[in-house]
């Protein structure tokens, strides 16, 4: 794309752009002292300014030097690309941050495919650049004029969003960041790829398992058809991506889906979110093992160090309160405001759904399975010793509240409903059944159509 030094009109111009490419500040200063107009010139063919060359090559000192001299941060080259676009393409995060600090416009479109800097960061897989641009989009006039959600889902002239590009190029890190920031997982392309493709179709085409995992975990529909009537499973088969096809097969078990529409899930603190995401990954990994079992495709075996980690986890569980739903794992998540605690897998099972309902805009919020109270927040549970008599367990807290909530058969969620939501959490299902039989045999099955 001509991001280096192309034809120059004079020898001084060539030396000037060459010095910018190499980051030679002394040479630049000397050339500018002899001819200050060099700062305003561009290369002959590609129309690259000194900012374009500095940004594409990661020369932050050169970039800062000319921005301080008043160089326009939104200068465009022959393809209407800005220095910010080139920095995002090449993954030069320092230059991206510097240009954003200089109020570079993130809502400019090039003339090649009408793509923004967000498209370019997603296409080339630069997660740090993507995050920086998204952070800027929440505080710049773009958020007021366009709206953040619209910017995240901006389309190029082929109808491709940044999520489409990240999925097609096999960029799972970018897929995750975009989904967390509101990218529409079910959006259809125009003429990009095959018309009417979703991000899942494009991930199936690229054969990237990690992208497929993340899209499925955020509710991507395996039955959605493109304009040719193909589902993602058919696309993966045609491309000979066997493992991807196995996971996308409509007859295989549904994956657990991150319950993003729930308000308290969107407001999770990082520590609690990490625990629940790990539980989601483990649940879907168990599902994958069952699907791929007996085929020539298999997941990597755990490393030798994983056994010792499991031993440590078992030791930790023995010293802390066990989850009163599964009786298998330590309580790591606390429900607020009631204070009841559960392990992360059981909390996830309470909130998750197996198949999203696109017609349900406002999903019912699950209640605490112990006291039937509403859930305002989920936080990391404080470590509580199982042998500490001064600190009541979740079961004890429930019994104390039994006078206030004597009719446990009412509510939108229950222990009895947890096993069906857990999917592959077989151990949790057994423990959950015991609780259902003893305490809440008549509870209604929860509805989590999100």
From Swiss-Prot:
Organism superkingdom: Eukaryota
Residue windows of the ANK repeats: 11-40, 46-75, 79-108, 113-142, 158-187, 195-225
A family per Pfam: Ank
Mutagenesis / variant outcome for changing residue 323 to A: Loss of autoubiquitination
Catalytic activity: S-ubiquitinyl-[E2 ubiquitin-conjugating enzyme]-L-cysteine + [acceptor protein]-L-lysine = [E2 ubiquitin-conjugating enzyme]-L-cysteine + N(6)-ubiquitinyl-[acceptor protein]-L-lysine
Enzyme Commission code(s) on record: 2.3.2.27
Pathway(s) per entry: Protein modification; protein ubiquitination
Quaternary structure (record): Interacts (via ankyrin repeats) with XA21.
Identification of the protein by name: E3 ubiquitin-protein ligase XB3
């Amino acid at each position: 794309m001509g991001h280096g030094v192309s034809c120059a009109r004079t020898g001084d111009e060539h030396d000037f752009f060459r010095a910018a490419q190499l980051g030679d500040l002394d040479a630049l200063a000397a050339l500018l002292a002899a001819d200050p107009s060099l700062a305003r010139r561009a290369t002959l063919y590609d129309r690259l300014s000194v900012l374009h060359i500095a940004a594409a090559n990661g020369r932050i000192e050169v970039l800062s030097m000319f921005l301080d001299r008043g160089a326009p941060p939104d200068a465009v080259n022959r393809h209407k690309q800005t220095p910010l676009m080139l920095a995002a393409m090449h993954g030069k995060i320092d230059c991206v941050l510097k240009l954003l600090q200089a109020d570079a416009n993130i809502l400019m479109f090039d003339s090649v495919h009408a793509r923004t800097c967000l498209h370019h960061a997603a296409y080339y897989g630069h997660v740090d650049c993507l995050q920086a641009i998204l952070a800027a989009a929440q505080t710049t006039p773009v958020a007021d004029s366009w709206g953040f959600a619209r910017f995240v889902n901006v389309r190029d002239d082929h109808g491709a969003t940044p999520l489409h590009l990240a999925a097609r190029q096999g960029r799972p890190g970018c897929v995750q960041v975009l989904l967390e920031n509101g990218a529409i997982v079910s959006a259809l392309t125009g003429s990009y790829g095959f018309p009417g493709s979703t991000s899942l179709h494009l991930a199936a085409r690229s054969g990237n398992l990690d992208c497929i995992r993340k899209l499925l975990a955020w509710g991507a529909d395996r039955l959605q058809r493109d304009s040719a009537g193909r589902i993602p499973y058919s696309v993966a088969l045609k491309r000979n991506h066997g493992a991807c096809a196995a996971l996308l097969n409509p007859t295989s078990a549904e994956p657990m889906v991150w319950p993003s529409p729930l308000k308290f899930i969107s407001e999770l603190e990082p520590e609690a979110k990490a625990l629940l995401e790990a539980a989601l990954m483990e649940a879907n990994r168990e599902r994958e093992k069952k699907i791929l079992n007996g085929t020539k495709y298999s997941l990597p075996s755990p490393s030798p160090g994983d056994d010792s980690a499991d031993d440590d986890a078992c030791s930790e569980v023995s010293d802390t309160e066990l989850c009163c739903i599964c009786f298998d794992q330590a309580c790591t998540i606390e429900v607020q405001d009631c204070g009841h605690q559960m392990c992360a897998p059981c909390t996830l099972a309470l909130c998750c759904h197996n198949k999203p309902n696109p017609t349900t805009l406002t999903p019912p919020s699950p209640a605490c399975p112990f006291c039937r109270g509403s859930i305002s927040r989920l936080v990391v549970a404080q470590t509580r010793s199982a042998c500490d008599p001064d600190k009541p367990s979740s079961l004890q807290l429930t019994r104390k509240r039994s006078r206030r909530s004597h009719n446990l058969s009412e509510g939108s969620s229950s222990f009895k409903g947890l096993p069906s939501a857990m999917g592959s959490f077989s151990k949790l299902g057994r423990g959950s059944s015991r609780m259902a039989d003893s305490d809440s045999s008549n509870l209604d099955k929860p509805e989590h159509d999100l």
